[in-house]
């Protein structure tokens, strides 16, 4: 056994090592928990490999304090401050370091950079969009440009005023966003937790959609069953839509309208064919003529359905697809707006105009019926839509496709809180139960 003096010395050494390891671990843990480590490294390089937040020998507390204060008040715009390392910011904002503390300074510099980048991205692009959107071909196209924009502007910040000005500039300035933001801040004490969730979700959708600053774009809000057509941040057209039933939900996605088809065929989806039309036509094959439909074989030939033995067909064996001929009694009406998503969902006219008179417009199999398709088409294709041609309701007209020279972004979202055209914040029922 070691002498008492040696045992005490060994214990002191062990305690020192433990505390030293805890100190190092605590500092390095922050680096390991960075939300955007690669972007932090990019910002460091853009800053000339300097300690952006902790420059040696300089009193830079004002810059750090400005970031901490913005993060601290992030609840007012529906964000959660602890996501942005708020506790670490609060503990270290007042610290200054000497050359001997360079390791700690570098670690904290990364932490502050990560907090700033995460805050910028969330204010600029919205939070949690990927959890709502099933398909998004727009965000990934602009992700690199978004990151470059944020980092290049952060890298040239020289003062607290510069930082605050830049962070404020990242928020949308359109009145819809501002109304929702003010509702959340002004009524925070009286709002239920569910209403706060509605407002916060809506703010994030607005941030996401508006930050692209597209020249032309369309928003379909499934929750309100409405469509808005924008030019930059200005709403040019608003109309009702009919969207999917709760059992056949319209998916949320971001794609492009690439083509408008005048007098489209309706190629009936297989699910509708097998579950609805096949049983109906087996009972009464004459309904095919009444509904102006055709059977098409694998080679694209129209089949004479009067000569078929309908008894042999069932869900497991039906070698045809069903197509509805063109005309005003076509389920797609006289205009179809093709979208680039792989989800099989598109915008279209309808032969059932009465559905738009209802306050409850969740009737479709998933596609989106548009109240005023000719108006929308005229905005997308100025001077190319002949209203008389469409309103003539021609029978069996060959479909006439028109490609858009520049495809128009289409966002299909789910905002249960929305600012309407009268500048009133409206709360909608969570018809699909997505917020529960």
Where are these regions (language model features)?
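Well-ordered beta-sheet/strand-loop patches within structured domains
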Residues: 31-35, 45, 110, 117, ...
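Cationic-aromatic interfacial patches
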Residues: 32-139
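Generic intrinsically disordered, low-complexity segments enriched for polar/acidic and small residues
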Residues: 13-17, 41, 79, 429
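Short linear sequence elements within intrinsically disordered, low-complexity coil regions
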Residues: 21-25, 58, 89-91, 182, ...
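Bacterial Sec-dependent N-terminal signal peptides
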Residues: 1-33
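Long, highly charged low-complexity segments enriched in Glu/Asp and Lys/Arg with interspersed Ser/Thr
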Residues: 145-152
